[in-house]
A protein has these predicted regions:
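Acidic, metal-coordinating helix/loop segments flanking the phosphotransfer/catalytic sites
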Residues: 42-65
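Acidic catalytic/metal-coordinating carboxylates
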Residues: 46, 76-85
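Conserved acidic segment of CheY-like receiver
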Residues: 7-28
């Protein structure tokens, strides 16, 4: 039983040639070491170029995998401020595409925003990854998503542990409200 290789139409969007090369090399390594994965790779260094390339894809020729740098220069003509705007458009027009966000932003607020808006199948902070990690990350995104790099996971953990932290008093207030206690009666408790 010979399995036919699955070819992924892949778009790498980053304004740094070295990063594009790293992604390309990781994909070529995967294609060489697995028999069932192949990649047709296109590159874009700006929102405008990416937008132009994305127009080539349709239901018969799908865009399957996208590497998206968030810190892309703005595109006034498209009304895009960063790669995040481009990510929203990819989600809308190519819902089947697996998006791997790669960024240097590592603050919790930006990471949460990207999750909320794009919800990528892969999310890596560039300083977290080397060639080996990148290959492993891509395999996971393709075969068993999601993949999040260490800093992203730490931000998620921090968000979860901070967002729902209720002390005894908070729980008591919620209980009283659920029992029909009026807001104006709360100070008397």
């Amino acid at each position: 039983l010979i399995m036919e290789a699955k070819e992924y139409n892949t778009l790498i969007i980053d304004d740094h040639p070295l990063i594009i090369e790293a992604f390309r090399n990781a994909l070529l390594h995967i294609a060489k070491t697995t028999e069932e994965l192949e990649f047709s790779i296109t590159e874009a260094t700006s929102c405008d170029t990416a937008q132009h390339i994305m127009e080539r894809y349709n239901p018969h020729k799908t865009l399957d995998l996208v590497f998206l740098d968030i810190k892309l220069p703005p595109s006034p003509t498209l009304g895009m401020l960063s790669g995040e705007d481009l990510g929203l458009e990819i989600r809308e027009k190519h819902p089947q595409a697996k998006i791997v966000v790669a960024t240097t932003f590592n603050d919790n607020y930006r990471i949460q925003n990207i999750f909320r808006n794009i919800n990528p199948e892969g999310f890596v902070i560039k300083s977290d990854i080397d060639t080996e990690t990148l290959v492993a990350a891509l395999m996971e995104v393709l075969l068993d998503p999601p993949y999040y790099s260490k800093t992203v996971l730490q931000a998620i953990r921090k968000y979860i542990s901070h967002d729902y932290l209720l002390d005894k008093w908070d729980r008591h207030l919620l209980y009283e409200l659920s029992q029909g206690t009026k807001m104006k009666e709360l100070p008397d408790l």
